[in-house]
Protein backbone atom coordinates (compact mmCIF):
# COMPACT_ATOMS: atom_id res chain seq x y z
CA UNK A 1 0.00 0.00 0.00
CA UNK A 2 1.03 3.52 -0.63
CA UNK A 3 1.84 5.82 2.17
CA UNK A 4 0.42 9.29 2.32
CA UNK A 5 3.75 10.83 1.31
CA UNK A 6 4.08 8.57 -1.74
CA UNK A 7 0.57 9.32 -2.94
CA UNK A 8 1.03 13.06 -2.45
CA UNK A 9 4.33 12.92 -4.34
CA UNK A 10 2.60 11.10 -7.18
CA UNK A 11 -0.19 13.67 -7.18
CA UNK A 12 2.33 16.51 -7.38
CA UNK A 13 4.14 14.83 -10.29
CA UNK A 14 0.89 14.09 -12.09
CA UNK A 15 -0.33 17.64 -11.62
CA UNK A 16 2.99 19.00 -12.88
CA UNK A 17 3.03 16.79 -15.96
CA UNK A 18 -0.60 17.05 -16.99
CA UNK A 19 -1.32 20.62 -15.96
CA UNK A 20 -0.14 21.92 -19.35
CA UNK A 21 -2.53 19.58 -21.11
CA UNK A 22 -5.62 20.90 -19.37
CA UNK A 23 -8.01 22.29 -21.99
CA UNK A 24 -9.82 25.45 -21.00
CA UNK A 25 -13.61 25.23 -20.93
CA UNK A 26 -14.06 28.07 -23.41
CA UNK A 27 -12.00 26.25 -26.04
CA UNK A 28 -14.50 23.42 -26.47
CA UNK A 29 -17.46 25.80 -26.71
CA UNK A 30 -15.71 27.96 -29.34
CA UNK A 31 -14.68 24.96 -31.41
CA UNK A 32 -16.94 24.44 -34.43
CA UNK A 33 -17.22 20.91 -35.73
CA UNK A 34 -18.94 20.21 -39.03
CA UNK A 35 -20.29 16.65 -38.80
CA UNK A 36 -21.74 16.68 -42.31
CA UNK A 37 -18.30 17.07 -43.86
CA UNK A 38 -17.00 14.31 -41.62
CA UNK A 39 -19.82 11.92 -42.46
CA UNK A 40 -19.64 12.62 -46.21
CA UNK A 41 -15.92 11.93 -46.05
CA UNK A 42 -16.62 8.53 -44.54
CA UNK A 43 -19.02 7.57 -47.33
CA UNK A 44 -16.42 8.29 -50.00
CA UNK A 45 -14.06 5.70 -48.58
CA UNK A 46 -13.89 2.22 -50.07
CA UNK A 47 -15.77 -0.49 -48.23
CA UNK A 48 -13.91 -2.25 -45.47
CA UNK A 49 -12.78 -5.79 -46.28
CA UNK A 50 -12.30 -7.78 -43.12
CA UNK A 51 -9.38 -10.20 -42.91
CA UNK A 52 -10.59 -13.72 -43.61
CA UNK A 53 -10.41 -16.17 -40.78
CA UNK A 54 -7.67 -18.70 -41.19
CA UNK A 55 -7.97 -22.28 -40.17
CA UNK A 56 -5.17 -23.78 -38.09
CA UNK A 57 -4.41 -26.28 -40.86
CA UNK A 58 -4.01 -23.59 -43.53
CA UNK A 59 -0.51 -23.32 -45.08
CA UNK A 60 -0.28 -19.65 -44.11
CA UNK A 61 0.12 -20.55 -40.45
CA UNK A 62 2.58 -23.38 -41.12
CA UNK A 63 6.08 -22.20 -40.06
CA UNK A 64 7.81 -24.76 -42.30
CA UNK A 65 6.22 -23.22 -45.38
CA UNK A 66 7.58 -19.81 -44.36
CA UNK A 67 11.11 -21.16 -44.10
CA UNK A 68 10.85 -22.83 -47.49
CA UNK A 69 9.50 -19.65 -49.11
CA UNK A 70 12.28 -17.54 -47.60
CA UNK A 71 14.94 -19.95 -48.82
CA UNK A 72 13.39 -19.92 -52.29
CA UNK A 73 13.33 -16.11 -52.36
CA UNK A 74 16.96 -15.89 -51.28
CA UNK A 75 18.03 -18.36 -53.96
CA UNK A 76 16.09 -16.47 -56.63
CA UNK A 77 17.41 -13.08 -55.57
CA UNK A 78 21.03 -14.27 -55.49
CA UNK A 79 20.77 -15.88 -58.93
CA UNK A 80 19.01 -12.86 -60.43
CA UNK A 81 21.42 -10.37 -58.88
CA UNK A 82 24.45 -12.20 -60.25
CA UNK A 83 23.04 -12.22 -63.78
CA UNK A 84 21.89 -8.59 -63.77
CA UNK A 85 25.10 -6.87 -62.68
CA UNK A 86 25.68 -3.72 -64.61
CA UNK A 87 29.01 -3.02 -66.28
CA UNK A 88 29.18 0.37 -64.54
CA UNK A 89 29.36 -1.26 -61.12
CA UNK A 90 32.07 -3.63 -62.28
CA UNK A 91 34.20 -0.84 -63.70
CA UNK A 92 33.94 1.18 -60.51
CA UNK A 93 35.00 -1.80 -58.41
CA UNK A 94 37.84 -2.53 -60.83
CA UNK A 95 38.98 1.08 -60.57
CA UNK A 96 39.04 0.83 -56.80
CA UNK A 97 41.14 -2.31 -56.99
CA UNK A 98 43.55 -0.87 -59.53
CA UNK A 99 44.02 2.42 -57.72
CA UNK A 100 46.84 2.02 -55.34
CA UNK A 101 47.41 4.68 -52.80
CA UNK A 102 50.94 4.89 -51.59
CA UNK A 103 51.04 5.23 -47.88
CA UNK A 104 53.96 7.51 -47.21
CA UNK A 105 54.83 8.80 -43.81
CA UNK A 106 55.33 12.52 -43.42
CA UNK A 107 58.62 13.23 -41.71
CA UNK A 108 59.49 16.36 -39.76
CA UNK A 109 61.56 18.81 -41.80
CA UNK A 110 60.98 16.98 -45.10
CA UNK A 111 58.99 18.19 -48.10
CA UNK A 112 58.30 16.30 -51.28
CA UNK A 113 59.04 18.10 -54.50
CA UNK A 114 56.55 17.80 -57.39
CA UNK A 115 59.12 15.85 -59.41
CA UNK A 116 59.52 13.23 -56.68
CA UNK A 117 62.66 14.28 -54.81
CA UNK A 118 62.66 15.14 -51.11
CA UNK A 119 63.97 18.40 -49.67
CA UNK A 120 65.18 18.69 -46.08
CA UNK A 121 65.45 21.89 -44.08
CA UNK A 122 65.42 22.97 -40.45
CA UNK A 123 64.68 26.21 -38.67
CA UNK A 124 67.44 27.73 -36.61
CA UNK A 125 66.14 29.15 -33.31
CA UNK A 126 69.29 31.26 -32.88
CA UNK A 127 68.55 33.15 -36.11
CA UNK A 128 64.88 33.96 -35.45
CA UNK A 129 63.65 30.78 -37.09
CA UNK A 130 65.40 31.24 -40.41
CA UNK A 131 65.59 28.12 -42.54
CA UNK A 132 68.78 26.17 -42.98
CA UNK A 133 68.88 24.19 -46.21
CA UNK A 134 70.00 20.61 -45.63
CA UNK A 135 69.75 19.34 -49.18
CA UNK A 136 67.68 17.39 -51.67
CA UNK A 137 67.50 13.61 -51.37
CA UNK A 138 66.24 10.68 -53.40
CA UNK A 139 64.29 9.12 -50.50
CA UNK A 140 62.25 10.57 -47.70
CA UNK A 141 64.13 8.52 -45.12
CA UNK A 142 67.48 10.01 -46.15
CA UNK A 143 66.01 13.51 -45.90
CA UNK A 144 64.55 12.69 -42.47
CA UNK A 145 67.95 11.42 -41.27
CA UNK A 146 69.56 14.67 -42.47
CA UNK A 147 66.98 16.61 -40.47
CA UNK A 148 67.60 14.44 -37.39
CA UNK A 149 71.35 14.96 -37.61
CA UNK A 150 70.98 18.75 -37.89
CA UNK A 151 68.34 18.92 -35.16
CA UNK A 152 70.48 16.88 -32.79
CA UNK A 153 73.47 19.16 -33.43
CA UNK A 154 71.40 22.34 -32.98
CA UNK A 155 69.15 21.41 -30.06
CA UNK A 156 70.87 18.46 -28.40
CA UNK A 157 68.78 16.06 -26.31
CA UNK A 158 65.74 18.34 -26.50
CA UNK A 159 65.41 17.90 -30.27
CA UNK A 160 62.26 16.32 -31.63
CA UNK A 161 63.50 13.70 -34.08
CA UNK A 162 62.00 11.47 -36.74
CA UNK A 163 64.07 8.50 -35.56
CA UNK A 164 64.75 9.09 -31.85
CA UNK A 165 66.32 5.66 -31.31
CA UNK A 166 69.00 6.42 -33.91
CA UNK A 167 70.03 9.78 -32.40
CA UNK A 168 73.77 10.32 -32.73
CA UNK A 169 74.45 6.96 -34.41
CA UNK A 170 74.85 8.17 -37.98
CA UNK A 171 77.10 10.73 -39.63
CA UNK A 172 75.66 13.58 -41.63
CA UNK A 173 74.01 12.13 -44.72
CA UNK A 174 75.50 13.14 -48.01
CA UNK A 175 73.27 15.21 -50.24
CA UNK A 176 72.46 12.73 -52.98
CA UNK A 177 71.14 15.23 -55.50
CA UNK A 178 73.68 17.74 -56.63
CA UNK A 179 73.08 20.98 -58.43
CA UNK A 180 73.74 20.94 -62.13
CA UNK A 181 77.09 22.43 -62.91
CA UNK A 182 77.89 24.22 -66.08
CA UNK A 183 80.37 22.48 -68.24
CA UNK A 184 82.85 24.63 -70.04
CA UNK A 185 81.53 25.02 -73.53
CA UNK A 186 84.35 25.15 -76.10
CA UNK A 187 84.19 28.36 -78.09
CA UNK A 188 84.32 28.34 -81.86
CA UNK A 189 87.79 28.71 -83.41
CA UNK A 190 87.03 31.97 -85.20
CA UNK A 191 86.76 33.89 -81.95
CA UNK A 192 89.72 33.94 -79.65
CA UNK A 193 90.11 35.74 -76.45
CA UNK A 194 93.50 37.12 -75.89
CA UNK A 195 94.83 37.41 -72.44
CA UNK A 196 98.01 39.06 -73.47
CA UNK A 197 98.09 42.79 -73.76
CA UNK A 198 99.46 44.29 -76.89
CA UNK A 199 102.00 46.98 -76.62
CA UNK A 200 101.44 50.04 -78.66
CA UNK A 201 104.06 52.55 -79.70
From Swiss-Prot:
One GO term under biological process is: negative regulation of wax biosynthetic process
Instruction: Provide this UniProt record's keywords sorted from A to Z.
Output: Activator, DNA-binding, Ethylene signaling pathway, Nucleus, Transcription, Transcription regulation
**Which Gene3D superfamilies does this one have?**
AP2/ERF domain (3.30.730.10)
Biased composition, class Low complexity, residue ranges: 74-92, 191-201
Q: Which residues bind DNA?
A: 106-164
Q: What are the subcellular locations of this protein? A: Nucleus
The region called Disordered is annotated at 73-105, 169-201
Q: Which GO terms describe its molecular function?
A: DNA-binding transcription factor activity; transcription cis-regulatory region binding
Where does it sit, as one GO cellular component term? nucleus
Q: What job does the chain carry out? A: Probably acts as a transcriptional activator. Binds to the GCC-box pathogenesis-related promoter element. May be involved in the regulation of gene expression by stress factors and by components of stress signal transduction pathways.
* PANTHER family per record: DNA-BINDING DOMAIN, ETHYLENE-RESPONSIVE TRANSCRIPTION FACTOR ERF105
Of which family is this protein a member?
A: Belongs to the AP2/ERF transcription factor family. ERF subfamily.
| Protein's UniProt name | Ethylene-responsive transcription factor ERF107
- Give the originating organism: Arabidopsis thaliana
**Gene name linked to the record:** ERF107
